[in-house]
């Protein structure tokens, strides 16, 4: 499938699609005959094309990047369902089973890094390596604010279920909006073919509006630590020098906690912003660092 005005929805890879629990998980595959298998999980409001720049550099690995539910070309979750951090996990396990019966490597960016960590903990020894690009599990549930959090979740759910589809008059309008989320123009355009659909009314955003809503609950700090401890694979944490962890103001504490609870945690600081894996200035070096970790 190709949208001429936006370019290929598969970038430099090949389109794939899996079905789990009635949901379609669309994705992109690079080096289909390669080995080992890398499952790549994108960040919040991104899509599978976010790995298009770095995936070829990970050869000879077979790299499969999936649109999470509500993103890109994948299905939206039903109105009675949610987009909490763990909600994709059962379907991702089913998709992994369809892709490979053997060991896999899991790689995630930002929110996708948190999801990748939970997935790796559940898959146990089947996950041989975990790569986290500028992301950790970094939001905790405060027991004193549980009712407030649930109230926000219910209010946001009603708000975004009622929201009409969003349209952009031009690609420039879409790019301007993405800048607010820390994207440079080229990275925003890279995502456009899976993020947008052309219609007579303009460029319709494919993303489920409910992804903007508050989560029902977050993991507690103790639960986060247990998830970390459950990952049997060695973990590579990649912190962008101008990235989210740096901007959060608590990167050292987060990294210290990760190092304390992961069984094996190596951390590197790499030049670039939060989306460094999409920046051609940095992807060759980043891919080399990842391949060194995998060997």
Each language-model region and where it sits:
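Alpha/beta-hydrolase fold catalytic core
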Residues: 1-38, 59-62, 100-103, 137, ...
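Active-site loop/oxyanion-hole signature of alpha/beta-hydrolase fold enzymes
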Residues: 23, 68-107
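Conserved HGGG/HGGXW glycine-rich cap/lid loop of the alpha/beta-hydrolase fold
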Residues: 30-75
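Conserved hydrolase catalytic core segment
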Residues: 102-145
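A catalytic-pocket lid/entrance helix-loop region that shapes and gates access to the active site
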Residues: 133-167
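Alpha/beta-hydrolase
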Residues: 167-246
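Conserved loop-alpha-helix segment in the C-terminal half of the alpha/beta-hydrolase fold
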Residues: 232-273
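Catalytic histidine-centered segment of alpha/beta-hydrolase-like enzymes
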Residues: 272-281
């Amino acid at each position: 499938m190709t949208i001429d005005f936006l370019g290929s929805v598969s970038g430099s890879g090949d389109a794939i699609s899996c079905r789990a629990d009635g949901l379609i998980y669309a994705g992109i595959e690079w080096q289909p005959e390669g080995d080992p298998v890398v499952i790549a999980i994108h960040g919040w409001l991104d899509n599978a094309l976010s790995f298009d720049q770095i995936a070829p550099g990970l050869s000879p690995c077979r790299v499969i990047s999936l649109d999470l539910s509500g993103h890109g070309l994948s299905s939206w979750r039903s109105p009675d369902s949610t987009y909490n951090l763990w909600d994709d996990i059962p379907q991702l396990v089913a998709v992994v089973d369809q892709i490979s019966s053997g060991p896999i490597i899991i790689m995630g960016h930002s929110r996708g890094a948190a999801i990748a960590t939970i997935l790796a903990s559940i898959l146990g020894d089947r996950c041989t390596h975990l790569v986290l690009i500028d992301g950790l599990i970094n939001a905790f549930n405060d027991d004193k604010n549980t009712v407030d959090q649930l109230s926000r979740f219910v209010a946001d759910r009603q708000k975004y279920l009622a929201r009409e589809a969003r349209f952009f008059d031009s690609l420039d309008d879409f790019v301007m909006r993405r800048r607010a989320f820390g994207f440079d123009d080229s990275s925003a355009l890279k995502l456009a073919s899976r993020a947008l659909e052309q219609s007579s009314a303009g460029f319709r955003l494919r993303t489920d509006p409910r992804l903007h809503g508050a989560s029902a609950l977050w993991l507690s700090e103790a639960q986060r630590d247990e998830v970390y401890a459950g990952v049997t694979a060695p973990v590579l944490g990649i912190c962008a020098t101008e990235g989210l962890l740096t901007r959060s103001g608590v990167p050292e504490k987060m990294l210290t906690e990760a190092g304390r609870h992961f069984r094996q945690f190596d951390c590197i600081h790499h030049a670039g912003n939060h989306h460094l894996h999409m920046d051609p200035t940095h992807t060759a070096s980043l891919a080399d660092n990842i391949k060194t970790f995998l060997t």
